[in-house]
Amino acid sequence: MAKHSKSIPGRGLRVADQIQRDLSEIIAFELKDPRVGMITITEVQVTPDYAHAKVFFTMLSDKKDDIKNTVSGLTAASGYIRGQLGRRLTIHTLPELHFVHDTSTARGIEMSKLIDEANASRAKDAED
């Protein structure tokens, strides 16, 4: 019993990775909703009981309206997506999908710009 409970986190990560791969294929090749354009699934977080999965995605557009439309399209199609996912996965509980726009890429770009500005300022101060 104790051995099984220790292996759950590793299994949870494997399940989340498999869900991420399958969702990417389903959304790219099977989903026909015009509100959902080209998106990238960046991460999937699954609860320990596999009841819920938080699906993080990025897209080319950073406009709030485009993001809102994409989230509503994914949410509206979540039943279909979950059904297709159920045909691919062999787990007892198929998680309910919650789609969230991933802002980590934009934050990373902003941080990179700040670092570049600080380095340029430091170089300018060194010249003076």
UniProtKB/Swiss-Prot annotation:
Q: Which InterPro entries match?
A: KH_dom-like_a/b, RbfA, RbfA_dom_sf
Q: Primary place of residence?
A: cytoplasm
Keywords assigned: Cytoplasm, Ribosome biogenesis
Keyword set includes Cytoplasm: yes
**What is one Gene Ontology biological process annotated in the Swiss-Prot or TrEMBL record?**
maturation of SSU-rRNA
- A single GO cellular-component term on record: cytosol
Gene Ontology molecular function terms on file: ribosomal small subunit binding
Where does the record place it? Cytoplasm
- Write down the SUPFAM superfamilies for this protein, in alphabetical order: Ribosome-binding factor A, RbfA (SSF89919)
Matches recorded under Pfam families: RBFA
Protein task: One of several proteins that assist in the late maturation steps of the functional core of the 30S ribosomal subunit. Associates with free 30S ribosomal subunits (but not with 30S subunits that are part of 70S ribosomes or polysomes). Required for efficient processing of 16S rRNA. May interact with the 5'-terminal helix region of 16S rRNA.
* Family, per entry: Belongs to the RbfA family.
Assembly and partners are described as: Monomer. Binds 30S ribosomal subunits, but not 50S ribosomal subunits or 70S ribosomes.
Q: What is this protein called?
A: Ribosome-binding factor A
- Natural source organism: Janthinobacterium sp. (strain Marseille)
